[in-house]
Amino acid sequence: MIVPRYYEDLSVLHENTMPARAYYIPASKRMDNLVEHREESDRMQLLNGTWKFQYFNSIYDVQDPFFEKDYDTENFDEIQVPSVWQMAGYDTHQYTNIRYPFPFDPPYVPQDIPCGAYAHTFVYHKDENAPKAFLNFEGVDSCFYVWINGSYVGYSQVSHMTSEFDITDLLQDGENSIAVLVMKWCDGSYLEDQDKFRMSGIFRDVYILKRPEQAISDYHIKTKIEDMLAKIELDVKFYSPANVKISIEDKNGAVVAVGSIAEEGTAVLEIANPELWNTENLYLYQLILETENEVIVDHIALRKIEIKDQVIYLNGQKIKFRGVNRHDSDPVTGFTISVEQITTDLTLMKQHNFNAIRSSHYPNAPFFYEMCDKYGFMVIDEADIEAHGPFMLYREEDTDYNRFKRWNEKIADDPAWEAAIVDRVKLMVERDKNRFCIVMWSMGNESAYGCNFEKALAWTKKFDPDRITQYESARYRNYDETYDYSNLDVYSRMYPALSEIQEYLDKDGSKPFLLVEYCHSMGNGPGDFEDYFQMIQDNDKMCGGFVWEWCDHAIAHGTAENGKKIYAYGGDHGEEIHDGNFCMDGLVYPDRTVHTGLLEYKNVYRPARVVSYDKESGELVLHNYMDFDDLKDYVKISYKLTQDGLVISKGKLSEVSVAPHSEGKISLNINVPENGKCYLKLIYQLKKEMPLLEKDHILGFDEIEVSQKDAKCQLAEKWLEKTSADSELQVNENDTQIHIKGREFAYTIDRRTALFTEMKFAGREYLNHPMELNIWRAPTDNDMYIKSEWRKAHYDKAYTRAYTTEVVQGKHGVKITSHASVVAETVQKILDLTITWTIDAAGKIDADIEATKDGEFPDLPRFGVRMFLDKKLADVRYFGMGPQESYRDKHQAASHGLYRANIGDLHEDYIRPQENGSHYDCEYVELNNSRYGIVASAEKAFSFNASYYTQEELEKKTHNYELTESDSVVFCVDYELNGIGSNSCGPVVLDQYRFNDVLFRFQFTLVPYVKG
């Protein structure tokens, strides 16, 4: 074999790598802008670019010494470094969540392990002031061997961590060659079973650092803040001792502290009356470390994170993590993420009120943390560890209890893995120890618990006692043994029900409760942000949470003929082991287009909320949910008063001082009309420009109904009014049909269904297909589990049948009453119905449907009528919650208004099609064109959905670009829909959002019309 089999040897994790150290970029002179422009340093030589590359299906196919200096690579392909080779057309894509993509046989991997051979030439000029050269790889998946000028340099693994080699003696002045052999898998892959597409290659930057002989090798910044004095301790290590001048400058460039050190040890500097860093005030000091031939510029954020009485404090202030889990993921570049891509993510996060990020489930590129310091995010830094696969091993006793009980046997509690697990934690902590945005170290994710994590936690706490530790998998254990949790500072949980959280707070509560993952944001959802928000705010021991997750993971495959982007997920590349679209679970689409779920999050976590408003006295009580800023310093507030969706007055509130986590009062007097649906909307805007945020950026809003006694939408009332038309209707009946004809209309009702089959008005047919009673919806991703119950109940096959029908004709119209039911093959009646249609002389249709559900059946997906309307009715006008989709448990980002849209604009284009685009709490909706239309209106608010796609089409197709439009506008007028929730990987829909009514009554009005 061309290389030693270190990739299957737990005793060899690295060979010839330098000791782990803090990340920094040196230069020959002071350079202050290295966070996002580090390549400008004259002591950093990037080796990124076009490299030669050859992919091998098996390590045994690598026969030639491609790493030799003069090896002819003419037959090699070319590849960009950094990149992943799957995105360059090699190998195949595979998405898997828990299951390993290879046999569980540690430390061994498949014998014919795929690999990639890289070769590159570069020019290197030696610098007499910086003669030492250190080769850095910031990310290589999974392990690699490296050569310089044909000489073997070393070996390393841990995909998402930096590996550094001293190559001083191997370089020559002028042209040099570098060769790298990257293995697709190694023994470390058993610890890299993260929920993501599996990708391979040199995916982060490769560079050489030029260093003086006498230079700093490592430094550790420690801060103590007491009584308006900041003490900065700088532990310094050297390659060879050097005189170091130390200075600290404030943001204006004024020197506030100086010191020096000349040998390994600790320098202590002090800053009086320091400015403290937090996520709302991003104050950074500049640290300058200067030796004779080198300057290192870093920054310091002075802050103190601590736990007192089970409550987390930052700088003495109680805080809440408004967090999100973020993977490195891009549909085109895969794991390879640039500064610009990170800036896009951080900007969107700031715009949507996040203040914290969990680096799930591995450390990010080092500049990511510098950017979080700069832009104001608290970070949970997570070790590159996930060993979820042992949970899925074959067990004779195949129960969840037994799986959880034995999960830790093979890795977490097997001492053979101690060195590998502790190594990964040490590498993370050592590299990122000087990044003050990091307030919490995480030992990894979903790997069970055991002796190896006890050791990792003990080392971490000893090395860095000032940060918090967390590891959610500590709750998984061998139930026959007792493990040491003393070095864990928080109790972390994923996707607990609210009742489970309350139980912990009531019975134990010995540590702060952290929602390390919650509100699984897959497809249409989540539907429970507001409920978790209330739980988090109601108890100080609840320190907040991190939503799962930031972005949909997908692979871009160009554009379909219909112009839609083609995004692929698990199973789309022919792989046998995959987890489908479970990777499509983000708050943004793969290209960072915003999901409606992100809008929902933003407004739930707005900086302020109305506690109460007395419209008589004008007293408005506000709560400030900021952790540090007084409301007057952060937010300016404007208001709009609307009547039936139209703005009738607006203005700005005077400045109001409200301390963080406190309430304050202000006066707002408005004149509310005597009639109509009236809402007062308060808009919170950013008062000042901030990094990544523009002044006047909208941070959220509150909406308060302020209607008087006649609180009815006048638009709806207009269509509900009795008409003055007074003409005799013609009613003709036969065994199957009832024909009703008036001066301008001709309707037909099918006696067998009690529903309309024809609806002609002014000579124009409105219905392309018969009306239906509808209890089904295209399952959302969050219907993942309940949909099996729904199908078992045959809800997806249900239809309406009528038994008896009575026709009563009067002077001003006709009333048709049917006893009917909703039925499906093999099961009993689902619903008993009394359906009454009252049609007046002008053609207005009043519906009254009384329903009784058989209590044996599960919650209904929905209940309403579905019409297939003339496709020319393409314009929509409605009074309800918009402009984006809204549901009974997902409408915090929507507000009441009079909205206009095109049918196509109402569709939310989820990559896996599903129920979408409904609008909640509506009283009136109108579909029309320039000549004619139809209105649905009701006294009691309803939901509606107008789409070019049937629910059958949404359910049948697996990708949005495959969707085919119907020949109709599919118009659903719904009494109710079941809640959205987050049950794709979370608790069931909360009781208050379930559609579990046994008795209900749906009354609404339909009015076809012609304009003019």
Predicted regions and their residues:
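Accessory beta-strand-rich segments of carbohydrate-active enzymes
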Residues: I2-M18, H37-R38, K52-F56, V84-T92, ...
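Extended substrate-binding grooves/exosites of carbohydrate-active enzymes
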Residues: M1-E39, A88, T96, S151, ...
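Extended acidic/polar, glycine-enriched regions
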Residues: Q172-E175, D235-K308, C678-W719, S724
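An acidic-aromatic loop/edge-strand motif
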Residues: V84-M87, T92, R99-Y108, Q157, ...
